[in-house]
């Protein structure tokens, strides 16, 4: 992880981030202002995450994407101006991204992430990957875990979206209401069950230091569902976890995501992959509904907004070391407008 310089908040920055400083404190904002973030994949979800991080006030954000702007990007990617077809996605997003907050250094990198060396990632405090293959996600997470770099990933497939975090051993502070001390004399006067309960003082709070351990992505994805412990937890596991496994396998096999222009063929392929994946995991073939394939095509802007909001929030929490992080998955189902946080894998 990159060495941190001493944080100094100028008067101009204090005015710019006044609301945030009131919300999570000066020290948390100082940590953000010394943080460097790598964001990979500038599709709809990437645009949402970029917006949230730039407005939060990180020190520097690198947008990495080697792909060109396509007609599908207009569905959810609001940082790319119209008339940008054929341009590099990261470069096309640069101007609007910079205009969101001139105090944040925003740069574009047009190189393919697969060509990046392990050392490339060590210059960042947080690495966030979107629209990447499973093998690449596992590789980059391994690098980040080894070098104590906060790792995040997320994707949106139609009505469905997810995010995952691997923060290694993460320390944070949480604000708790202060327990008011009650004098012995008052306890004797106010005798009874209520008098013995802790008195919460809503006007005062204290910061409590905590520590939590995260597991690597590889462990979270490779759960042995044949074990008795896993079988007992299966009923509580979000079905979107298994949908994610299916969509990752599709991306690995086809080197792309399901395309609306190829709906019939891709729907049939998704059903076949679903059968194979669930069988290999040793879970029921009926775990996913038969019509699941109808709801996981393309990126939907509202789903990108929700997942991007959560993903951006979690990155800010990790960098500022303020409040408990989501450990380790967040799944969102746009059909039911339901979001679930679940901890999967060994710790």
From Swiss-Prot:
Pathway noted in the entry: Protein modification; protein sumoylation
Major location category of this protein: nucleus
Database matches in CDD domains: Aos1_SUMO (cd01492)
GO biological process, one term: protein sumoylation
Gene Ontology cellular component list: SUMO activating enzyme complex
InterPro entries: ThiF/MoeB/HesA, ThiF_NAD_FAD-bd, Ubiquitin-activating_enz, UBQ/SUMO-activ_enz_E1-like
Keyword terms, alphabetized: Ligase, Nucleus, Ubl conjugation pathway
Entry keyword annotation includes Zinc: no
UniProt-listed SUPFAM superfamilies: Activating enzymes of the ubiquitin-like proteins
Highest taxon in the source lineage: Eukaryota
A GO term, aspect molecular function: ubiquitin-like modifier activating enzyme activity
Gene3D superfamilies: NAD(P)-binding Rossmann-like Domain
Keyword Ligase included in the entry's annotation: yes
Known role: The heterodimer acts as an E1 ligase for sumo1, sumo2, and sumo3. It mediates ATP-dependent activation of sumo proteins followed by formation of a thioester bond between a sumo protein and a conserved active site cysteine residue on uba2/sae2.
Family statement: Belongs to the ubiquitin-activating E1 family.
Subunit structure comment from the entry: Heterodimer of sae1 and uba2/sae2. The heterodimer corresponds to the two domains that are encoded on a single polypeptide chain in ubiquitin-activating enzyme E1. Interacts with ube2i.
Name used for this protein in its record: SUMO-activating enzyme subunit 1
Native species: Xenopus tropicalis
Lineage: Eukaryota, Metazoa, Chordata, Craniata, Vertebrata
């Amino acid at each position: 992880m990159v060495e941190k310089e001493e944080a100094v908040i100028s008067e101009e920055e204090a005015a710019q981030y006044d609301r945030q400083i009131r919300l999570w404190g000066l020290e948390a904002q100082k940590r953000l202002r010394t943080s460097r973030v790598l964001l990979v994949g500038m599709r709809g979800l990437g645009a949402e995450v970029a917006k949230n991080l730039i407005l939060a006030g990180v020190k520097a954000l690198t947008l990495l994407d080697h792909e060109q702007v396509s007609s599908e990007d207009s569905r959810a990617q609001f940082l790319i101006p119209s008339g940008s077809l054929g341009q590099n996605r990261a470069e096309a997003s640069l101007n609007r991204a910079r205009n969101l907050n001139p105090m944040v250094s925003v740069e574009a990198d047009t190189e393919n992430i697969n060509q990046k060396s392990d050392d490339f990632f060590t210059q960042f405090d947080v690495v966030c990957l979107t629209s990447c293959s499973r093998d690449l996600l596992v590789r980059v997470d391994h690098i980040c875990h080894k070098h104590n770099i906060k790792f995040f990933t997320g994707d949106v497939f139609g009505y469905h979206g997810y995010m995952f975090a691997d923060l290694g051993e993460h320390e944070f502070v949480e604000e708790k209401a202060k327990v008011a001390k009650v004098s012995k004399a008052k306890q004797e006067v106010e005798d009874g069950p209520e008098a013995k309960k802790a008195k919460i003082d809503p006007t005062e709070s204290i910061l409590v230091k905590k520590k939590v351990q995260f597991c690597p992505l590889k462990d979270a994805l490779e759960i042995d569902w044949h074990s008795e412990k896993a079988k007992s937890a299966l009923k509580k596991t979000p079905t979107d976890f298994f949908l994610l496994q299916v969509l990752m396998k599709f991306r690995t096999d086809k080197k792309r995501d399901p395309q609306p222009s190829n709906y019939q063929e891709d729907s049939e392929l998704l059903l076949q992959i679903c059968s194979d994946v669930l069988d290999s995991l040793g879970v029921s073939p009926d775990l996913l509904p038969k019509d699941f394939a109808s709801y996981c095509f393309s990126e939907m802007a509202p789903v990108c907004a929700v997942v991007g909001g959560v993903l951006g929030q979690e990155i800010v929490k990790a960098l500022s070391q303020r409040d408990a992080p989501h450990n380790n998955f967040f799944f969102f189902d746009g059909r039911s407008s339901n979001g679930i946080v679940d901890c999967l894998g060994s710790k």
